[in-house]
């Protein structure tokens, strides 16, 4: 998903990945009308002001483009891992996603960070340089910071919020999202 607010390093990584593997990665962007409506209601950086505003931003920049990306799909393969957060601790290898009416496959569910690092090193997988600068979880630039020593992997995401269950909504079922 090209949210329009990704780090330059992330955009460069997409290009490097396409070149290394000789593939084309589809990019799904938010609709300008949706961005304009969001900015009119909350302000361009209104996501800092409330969880509601942040969820609305993620809806415009992530959820709606994802819906277009998955339109007609029967399977969605993700990179979710149980070790990323308490909220993801029970991630199964495969599950039915009733909101999207598809099977969601999480092949890395039981991989820990050491397994990932070994795989990346052994296979020459391109890596976002932000990982080396303390960003184990990378999203939109304004919503992501480097973590401090000892912090959980996803502590740098939406750091201004107090709730431990911070998610953008991509991997949260509707009823769980309503509880957040």
Swiss-Prot record:
Entries under SUPFAM superfamilies matching the protein: Adenine nucleotide alpha hydrolases-like (SSF52402)
Cofactor(s) of this protein: [4Fe-4S] cluster
Catalysed reactions, semicolon-separated: [thioredoxin]-disulfide + sulfite + AMP + 2 H(+) = adenosine 5'-phosphosulfate + [thioredoxin]-dithiol
GO cellular component, one term: cytoplasm
PANTHER family on file: 5'-ADENYLYLSULFATE REDUCTASE 1, CHLOROPLASTIC, 5'-ADENYLYLSULFATE REDUCTASE 3, CHLOROPLASTIC
Protein name in the entry: Adenosine 5'-phosphosulfate reductase
Keywords: Cytoplasm, Iron, Iron-sulfur, Metal-binding, Oxidoreductase
Cofactor binding comment, as recorded: Binds 1 [4Fe-4S] cluster per subunit.
Active site: 168 (nucleophile)
GO biological process: cysteine biosynthetic process; sulfate assimilation, phosphoadenylyl sulfate reduction by phosphoadenylyl-sulfate reductase (thioredoxin)
Predominant subcellular localization, coarse grouping: cytoplasm
EC number: 1.8.4.10
Domain of life: Bacteria
HAMAP family the UniProt entry points to: CysH
Protein family per UniProt: Belongs to the PAPS reductase family. CysH subfamily.
One Gene Ontology MF term: metal ion binding
InterPro entries in UniProt: APS_reductase (IPR011798), PAPS/APS_Rdtase (IPR004511), PAPS_reduct_dom (IPR002500), Rossmann-like_a/b/a_fold (IPR014729)
Binding site for [4Fe-4S] cluster: 57-58, 140, 143
Protein's job: Catalyzes the formation of sulfite from adenosine 5'-phosphosulfate (APS) using thioredoxin as an electron donor.
Record's subcellular location: Cytoplasm
């Amino acid at each position: 998903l090209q949210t329009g607010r990704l780090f330059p390093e992330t955009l460069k990584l997409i290009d490097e990945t396409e070149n290394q593997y000789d593939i084309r990665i589809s990019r799904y962007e938010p609709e300008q009308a949706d961005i304009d409506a969001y900015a009119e209601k909350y302000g361009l950086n209104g996501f800092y002001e409330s969880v509601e505003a942040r969820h609305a931003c993620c809806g415009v920049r992530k959820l709606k483009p994802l819906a277009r990306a998955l339109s007609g799909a029967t399977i969605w393969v993700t990179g979710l891992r149980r070790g990323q957060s308490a909220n993801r601790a029970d991630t199964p290898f495969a599950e039915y996603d009733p909101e999207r009416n598809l099977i969601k496959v999480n092949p890395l569910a039981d991989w820990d960070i050491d397994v990932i690092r070994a795989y990346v090193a052994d296979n020459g997988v391109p890596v976002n340089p932000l990982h080396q600068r303390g960003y184990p979880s990378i999203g939109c630039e304004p919503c992501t910071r480097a973590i401090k020593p000892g912090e959980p992997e996803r502590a740098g995401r939406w750091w201004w919020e107090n709730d431990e269950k911070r998610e953008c909504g991509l991997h949260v079922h509707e009823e769980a999202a309503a509880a957040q």
